[in-house]
Amino acid sequence: MQIRGKEVDFRVSRLKDAAALELAINNMGKKEEEIRKEKTLTAVISKTNEMFRQFFIDATGTDVLVDCEDLQESKETYTEFLRGVGEQKNKILDFSVSDIK
C-alpha cells in the first residue's frame, strides 16, 4: 500500500494488521477527547497532526507523516488510507465458499 509516496506493508486481511488498526482507532478516540479541550488554534492543529501521525505509527508501524505540518494534508492522508482499507475489506467480504471449485 502506498501512503504519501512510501510503500507500507499493510493488509487488513492479515490478523496482526487488523489488530493494529483497531488499536490505532481506539487510541485516536482517546486523543480526540483531549484535543477538544484545547483553546488555541495552533494547539488544535499541532495535537491533531500528532494524533494522525500516531495513528499511522500504531496502525502500520510507519511514520508516514513525519515531515507533515499541514493539518489538511494529514486529514487527506488519513482519509485515503481508510478508503484503501475499505477496498481491502470489500475484497475480503466478497469471498464465498461457493466460489471454490
Regions found by a protein language model. Give the residues of each.
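Short, surface-exposed, charged amphipathic helix/loop patches that serve as local interaction elements
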Residues: 15-101
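Short, extreme N-terminal segment that most often corresponds to the first beta-strand
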Residues: 1-17
